[in-house]
Amino acid sequence: MSDLSHIRNFSIIAHIDHGKSTLADRFIQMCGGLTAREMEAQVLDSMDLERERGITIKAHSVTLHYKAQDGKTYQLNFIDTPGHVDFTYEVSRSLAACEGALLVVDAGQGVEAQSVANCYTAIEQGLEVMPVLNKMDLPQADPDRVKDEIEKIIGIDATDAVACSAKSGMGVDEVLERLVQSIPAPEGEIDAPLQALIIDSWFDNYLGVVSLVRVRQGRVKKGDKILVKSTGKVHLVDSVGVFTPKHTQTADLKAGEVGFIIASIKDIHGAPVGDTLTLSNTPEVEVLPGFKKIQPQVYAGLFPVSSDDFEDFRDALQKLTLNDSSLQYMPESSDALGFGFRCGFLGMLHMEIIQERLEREYDLDLITTAPSVIYELELKTGETITVDNPSKLPDVSAVNDFREPIVTATILVPQEHLGNVITLCIEKRGVQRDMQFLGSQVQVRYDLPMNEVVLDFFDRLKSTSRGYASLDYHFDRYQSANLVKLDVLINGDKVDALALIVHRDNAAYKGRALTEKMKELIPRQMFDVAIQAAIGGQIIARTTVKALRKNVLAKCYGGDVSRKKKLLEKQKAGKKRMKQVGNVEIPQEAFLAVLRLDS
């Protein structure tokens, strides 16, 4: 008999800073998941980085037992998801393990772009979406306006949305009651052959690969032999359990539950995310539909400062890819920086987070080159190639057509900041698609070049709208554009790691700005250092870092002018010889100067 009516699986989805993690804390407290001593703010954000930045990066799962007012005890498996646009992949994976989702909306700020995007993902996957108005204790909370926005912008009924304040704990028990009533119980047979979906996995130095799974059918317990469908390998289960949020072992995991499986898998790619697990004696079980592979949007080169760290760096990347399956990498070598990897990220925040995690968790020193998006080139020979690294661009004479990626951006902004946002979009070469007035907010849709969006668009959008505008974007198409490669020459030598692909209209401005920025960052040498920006063979900007020179005339008090001339000529000849053989050290900041051209 498989009675799953007491299980509820749900995710919490919301825009950044609308209080998902705080609400999760309240659930844990009310259901007694942790003692008062162990409780801390944002208990699920376990990474230091998450706490410092105040954002959720990884989705976290928790199993709690809630005694409802009808006298039954329900098992709640919930997943706290990230709200930032760079981590939408984490959200879609979490939703695949659930039957319902709580849409948390800040009652002061109202609906924002990311809530809309995540909510549509949930509805597409057939989940029951239950709106919750959070932050009701704030003086600026306006529940009626926000309910109206939820109905107008997202299109789900919000008349009886539950109002609560996760910070003060007001109304949280009501959220749990409503959740138990409105979110459906999972379906599945405990007696059927095991079928489990891997939602997430990470590497533990002692336990091997730990996989977070959602069991669809059957059950799994310690001592079972499991088969990983994609690799065909069989592993012995060491332990199964759930997070309460502590690591808690249980006797077994049954259909409808979410928990972890440890089976001493030592190979990092032994249990990929989105794979199906079954028992070794029922290998004919169907593979569950996994997750679509996500395409990175931004590429950047990562190089270890010391070449001795290359092997450690590769191991670290492998372990990180297991935990973050949207990260892609391949080996790359650069004349200026030696050996490293070209990594693909979902956006700039993702790139920063990965670099910081590598430096902290694996103790590496890294240099990052300027990020670039993927361009499509049609060559004179008729073939089409994609390029993600400016230094790998073929010669201009061989290229027939240059195409850049265009994204469709949806921006939600209060009416008073609309003018600034439109000005910013025009500056970034945007084309307006449509505009809708929804209550006090405006929803504008723009087609924007992706390389303008990924660099600093998000920060500029926030500052121009005083933090009120919100953004969601997705790749739409490739479109022809007048693009050129901007090379940076230092003392006449091209530095491959500093090359950029820019629009021809902005090239002269970008070239000047970049050389000026580099002049500030490259330390003065004993000889003049020329910094030039060039398109092909044409130099479009130049600055010089002046030489440090010793005053060789200090010892000549009076005396003949020819004596002074002789000393100056001697110094000049020495500097000239030095310049021919001298190397210039380029500091890490210079490689990232490209990012901060506009600021």
From Swiss-Prot:
Lineage of origin: Bacteria, Pseudomonadati, Pseudomonadota, Gammaproteobacteria, Pseudomonadales
Role noted for this protein: Required for accurate and efficient protein synthesis under certain stress conditions. May act as a fidelity factor of the translation reaction, by catalyzing a one-codon backward translocation of tRNAs on improperly translocated ribosomes. Back-translocation proceeds from a post-translocation (POST) complex to a pre-translocation (PRE) complex, thus giving elongation factor G a second chance to translocate the tRNAs correctly. Binds to ribosomes in a GTP-dependent manner.
GO cellular component: plasma membrane
Spans through the membrane: none
Gene: lepA
Subcellular location(s) per record: Cell inner membrane
Gene Ontology MF, one: guanosine tetraphosphate binding
Gene Ontology BP term (one): positive regulation of translation
Protein name, UniProt field: Elongation factor 4
Alphabetically ordered keywords of this record: Cell inner membrane, Cell membrane, GTP-binding, Hydrolase, Membrane, Nucleotide-binding, Protein biosynthesis
UniProt cross-references to InterPro entries, sorted A to Z: EF-4, EFG_III/V, EFG_V-like, EFTu-like_2, LepA_C_sf, LepA_CTD, LepA_IV, P-loop_NTPase
Domain (tr-type G) ranges: 5-187
